[in-house]
Amino acid sequence: MLSGVELSRDEALVLLRSDPANYLSLLAAAARLRSAYFGNSVKLNYLVNLKSGLCPEDCTYCSQRLGSAAQILKYSWLKSEDAIDQAEQGLAGGASRVCFVASGRGPSDRDVDRVAGLVGDFKTRNPQAEVCACLGILKEGQAERLKSCGVDAYNHNLNTSEEKYSEICTTHEFSDRTNTVKAAKAAGLSPCSGLIVGMGESDEELIDALFALRELGSESVPVNFLMPFEGTPLADTWLLTPVKCLQILCVARFVAPRSELRIAGSREMHLRSLQPLALHVANSIFLGDYLTSEGQSAAEDLAMIEDGGFVILDPRASAPQGGVEPVLRKRGAGTELQPNA
């Protein structure tokens, strides 16, 4: 693959099904690709949840879904100054990209104008920062509006394969997601799209999802591991092992060797003690907390990166010297408490 030869679906399936006892050999091969394209750098991304919960969509995996009984934070749009404060704390912690996220099917034109104003103010104060927006399914002209205000990237995950999609969501279709990614890319936004693993997908469905992402040209691929929130249809769904998670990440690297590969939601819960090894395959993480659950402390993230011999893209951050259930986020955006940054 270093010579430019692309991995086939059959080859990817063989690698995904390889003997778990030999995972270190798989990891070493994936690490060579990671090193060739990204050296020893790790990109830190920071999430700001602009609007939490009360989503009309019925995605089975999501704590913000229609009918969710998960005891998450629920709030409408943050004030612009509060969102910027949250984002700047992420930058101070070492993040080079801030991801502004809002729950819902997709934004109204008024919502896009609101985010455009926020991003404009944020970029004026922090011109070096990258901004990714994640607002749901886009309508005509909205991607262009976001691009014009300074948004650099747009996230809209495929989450799973087209074949499995109707099992995890009935309120919109797989094509709604692919069309949004295509629209973002056509508008000049960097396409960020990934998946969620551990939802009961078959090996073939997982491979199909990865190849769909490659065909879309996703430049940043977040790999989320299912958070089985109580109060959602997938509560108590535990189908992954740490080694299986590493195998999935390795295959993702082989399928898209030049893409930013991010270990994303629930990495702490599923990779557990093998989490540091994942940095030899992935070159990006979310710093601190997720949308509705807490991550490990920012200090632990920075220490893990430094201890592994990696460097952060933003040199301002440095590591300090010297249960598995999801923890509901009760700090940061939408609260009076300081964020985990």
From Swiss-Prot:
Domain Radical SAM core: 40-264
Domain of life, source organism: Bacteria
UniProt-listed GO biological process terms: biotin biosynthetic process
Keyword S-adenosyl-L-methionine: yes
Key words of the record: 2Fe-2S, 4Fe-4S, Biotin biosynthesis, Iron, Iron-sulfur, Metal-binding, S-adenosyl-L-methionine, Transferase
Residues the entry annotates as binding [4Fe-4S] cluster: 55, 59, 62
Cofactor: how bound: Binds 1 [4Fe-4S] cluster. The cluster is coordinated with 3 cysteines and an exchangeable S-adenosyl-L-methionine.
EC numbers, comma separated: 2.8.1.6
Enzyme kind, highest EC tier: transferase
Molecular-function annotations in GO: 2 iron, 2 sulfur cluster binding; 4 iron, 4 sulfur cluster binding; biotin synthase activity; iron ion binding
UniProt-annotated binding residues for [2Fe-2S] cluster: 99, 132, 192, 262
Classification via SUPFAM superfamilies: Radical SAM enzymes
Reaction it catalyzes: (4R,5S)-dethiobiotin + (sulfur carrier)-SH + 2 reduced [2Fe-2S]-[ferredoxin] + 2 S-adenosyl-L-methionine = (sulfur carrier)-H + biotin + 2 5'-deoxyadenosine + 2 L-methionine + 2 oxidized [2Fe-2S]-[ferredoxin]
Region feature (Disordered): 317-341
Cofactor dependency: [4Fe-4S] cluster; [2Fe-2S] cluster
Keyword S-adenosyl-L-methionine: yes
Metabolic or biological pathway, per its Swiss-Prot or TrEMBL entry: Cofactor biosynthesis; biotin biosynthesis; biotin from 7,8-diaminononanoate: step 2/2
Stored InterPro entries: Aldolase_TIM, BATS_dom, Biotin_synth/BioAB, Biotin_synthase, Elp3/MiaA/NifB-like_rSAM, rSAM
CDD domains reported in the protein's UniProt record: Radical_SAM
PROSITE patterns, sorted: RADICAL_SAM
Chain's role: Catalyzes the conversion of dethiobiotin (DTB) to biotin by the insertion of a sulfur atom into dethiobiotin via a radical-based mechanism.
Family according to the record: Belongs to the radical SAM superfamily. Biotin synthase family.
Subunit: Homodimer.
Name of the protein in question: Biotin synthase
Organism: Renibacterium salmoninarum (strain ATCC 33209 / DSM 20767 / JCM 11484 / NBRC 15589 / NCIMB 2235)
